A protein has these predicted regions:
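Conserved HGGG/HGGXW glycine-rich cap/lid loop of the alpha/beta-hydrolase fold
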Residues: 15, 22-77, 99, 109-114, ...
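Non-transmembrane, interaction-prone segments in cytosolic or luminal domains
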Residues: 5, 58, 73-75, 89, ...
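Flexible "cap/lid" subdomain of the alpha/beta-hydrolase fold that forms the substrate-access gate
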Residues: 3, 31-32, 82-90, 97-98, ...
């Protein structure tokens, strides 16, 4: 990157949660509508590294690690998909307020596209443009009864044992070597 990024944690009001934020060009183009980047599943700010200089050429750019990803706080999410979605959307709104952005261009990739869409539906007054790059979301899971019929008992037992472990736990344990 040729532009000098500013990286910092943004504390979310009323919680102990923090969102890791990379910003570029926030002073020299402060009159332009900022571009906010939301990464996808299993990703983080690094997803955008090859695009940041170009994207920040003539406007402020913010890339955030969504809660539970990258350097952002690990929080307990609801097991209800709709509630978990609202938790993530609210964290983006709390972040926007903390940073002081009135309106933004919101770009989401993959799961970030799903979250960007949900955010825009809930906070349309804050989104000037919505850009979706390969967006997707998780369908609601089948009822417990259907699920228990479809999955063999031994698989359910293994799932109970490993469910506390996140698939990216090994990467987090690697610390800086995992980047």
């Amino acid at each position: 990157m040729s532009s000098r990024p500013i990286c910092r944690y943004i504390a979310l009001s009323g919680t102990a949660s923090r969102i890791w934020t990379l910003s570029l060009n926030t002073e020299s183009c402060s009159t332009k509508t900022p571009l906010v980047l939301l990464h996808g599943m299993g990703s983080g700010i690094a997803l955008w590294v090859l695009n940041l200089d170009y994207l920040a050429h003539n406007r402020p750019v913010y890339a955030i690690d969504v809660l539970g990803f990258g350097r952002s706080s690990r929080v307990s999410f609801s097991s209800d998909p709709a509630e978990a979605e609202q938790q993530l959307v609210q964290s983006i709104e709390d972040w926007r307020k903390a940073v002081g952005i009135d309106r933004m261009i919101l770009l989401g990739h993959s799961l970030g596209g799903y979250l960007a869409t949900s955010y825009a539906l809930n906070h349309a007054e804050c989104v000037q443009h919505l850009i979706l790059a390969d967006p997707w979301g998780f369908p609601q899971s089948p009822s417990q009864l259907e699920q228990s019929r479809m999955i063999p008992r031994w698989v359910r037992m293994v799932r109970c044992i490993i469910s506390p472990f996140n698939p990216f736990s090994g990467l987090r344990l690697a610390g800086p070597w995992g980047e």
